[in-house]
Amino acid sequence: MNYLDFEKPLAEIEGKAEELRAMARREEGMDVEEQAAALDKKAADLLRTLYADLTPWRKCQVARHAQRPHCQDYIDALFTEYTPLAGDRNFADDHAIMGGLARFDDTPVVVIGHEKGHDTKTRIERNFGMARPEGYRKAVRLMDLADRFNLPVITLVDTPGAYPGKGAEERGQSEAIARSTEKCLQIGVPLISVIIGEGGSGGAVAFATADRLAMLEHSVYSVISPEGCASILWKDAEKMREAAEALRLTAQDLHKLGVCDVVINEPLGGAQRNKDAAIESVGKAIASMLAGFGDADRATLIAGRRKKFLDLGSKGLAA
């Protein structure tokens, strides 16, 4: 387990418990279970205390944890018959974006998501989840396909933001993000988005302009990273804690503001401590949201989605 900086006291306690058990395995007849169990209880109590009231900055740290389940994990666990589509039919295939046809609970769907990678090699291959223009254009292809065949769209958002490189800008990064956002508003099928980690800026909005937006309990969604905000406003990236507070980027704040429709509970200690339980909770939330659409027709879906976003900001700002 990789520990975050605020989890260091927890790391020490869990480390001591593991050391005791390792000693018992090496030395036959040594009984340490009572001592180890006491340390386990102490660690569980501390974990509960640490996660009872996380600050926005600490939630950012949890949302970025490298061991949280990623898009690939959710697709493998929740979807069957997944058939990926590649390329934007124009320039290249962007590996930061996964997407294809699949079945969810036997319902044919299109699933699209950001994939950050799980080790050095795959993180480089996936560009750390930062999509280039061809990634957003691939997503538009998939949404067009879903619209044509009347398939619900499910997006899984986990990105620090769209890739800001020179080549991406030359190939029309801002236009590609805008087209993807526009396509979200145009398709006449149910569109569900789940923020599973980071929801960074326009790179996230391009997939999250949905009928229903769900966020994992410790995920974040913001126009800019706390570090970027602090650098611009205070010329000091070290003020990221103050920036995180001001940005109102947590799932709980965004639910109060009406941006987030559903907050999905995570296992104690975050999704990284129990991936299977976190994935199961997301699956149940998606199933519930899909069932809520009933027999809504194309015109109703498009009108309702547009109204939802036009109404943002009209309520909840005083919360």
Curated annotation (Swiss-Prot):
InterPro entries: Acetyl_CoA_COase_a_su (IPR001095), ClpP/crotonase-like_dom_sf (IPR029045), COA_CT_C (IPR011763)
EC identifiers of the protein: 2.1.3.15
GO biological process, one term: fatty acid biosynthetic process
Annotated Pfam families: ACCA (PF03255)
Domain annotation CoA carboxyltransferase C-terminal: ranges: 38-292
Reactions this protein catalyses: N(6)-carboxybiotinyl-L-lysyl-[protein] + acetyl-CoA = N(6)-biotinyl-L-lysyl-[protein] + malonyl-CoA
Key words of the record: ATP-binding, Cytoplasm, Fatty acid biosynthesis, Fatty acid metabolism, Lipid biosynthesis, Lipid metabolism, Nucleotide-binding, Transferase
Gene Ontology, cellular component aspect: acetyl-CoA carboxylase complex
GO terms of molecular function: acetyl-CoA carboxylase activity; ATP binding; carboxyl- or carbamoyltransferase activity
Family, per entry: Belongs to the AccA family.
Protein name as catalogued: Acetyl-coenzyme A carboxylase carboxyl transferase subunit alpha
Organism listed in the record: Jannaschia sp. (strain CCS1)
